[in-house]
Amino acid sequence: LSEDAEARIFEIISYSILKNHYKNTKVYFGYSLSSLQEEKLQLYKTGRTNANDGGIDFVMRPVGRFFQVTEVDNYDKYLLDIDKVMHFPITFVIRTKTSREKVLNELEAYIDERANGMVVIRERYHNAIEEIITINELNEWTNELSNDDVDSILRDIDIYYRLEMNMDIVDDD
C-alpha cells in the first residue's frame, strides 16, 4: 500500500484487509441477557469502486457501521460524505501515511473553521467521525493476520480487481 496507489486499487486492497481484519471479531446481540446471540462482524462492499455514485463504500454487519474510502487532500469532501449519511457516524479509510491523529486533528480544525463558531454544527460533524484508518493501520493489521487470512486477502484482491476491470473471474476450486 502506498500513497500513490491508484484510487480503485487502494479501495480494493483496503476492503480486503479490513474484511479479513474484522471477520473474527465477535459481537453479541439480543433483547435481553438470556437472548444474546454471538455473531461475527462482516464487511460488505456496497458497489463498484470509484463509481462516483455518492454511495458509501463498505458497510459492516451486524453493527451497521459505514466506511468511506478517500484521500487526505480535500476536507470539503469529508463533510459532504458526512452530510450524505445525515451525520450518521462514518469511518474514513484514507490513502495516506500521515498519522491518523494528525489527520483527525486537521479535519477537526477544518470543521471548527467552517462552523464559524456555531457549536451545534461543529459538534454534529465532530460526532459523525467514528474512526480514521490510514495506510499505517492497514499495514499494521495485515502484519497481525494469519497466513490463511493473508491468502484470503490475496484472493479477495484478485476477485475484486477482475470485477473492476471487467475481466473473467478465475475459480481456483
What does each model-identified segment do?
Residues L1-K26:
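Interdomain/boundary linker segments immediately adjacent to catalytic/signaling cores
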Residues Y22-D173:
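Catalytic core segments in nucleotide and nucleic-acid processing enzymes
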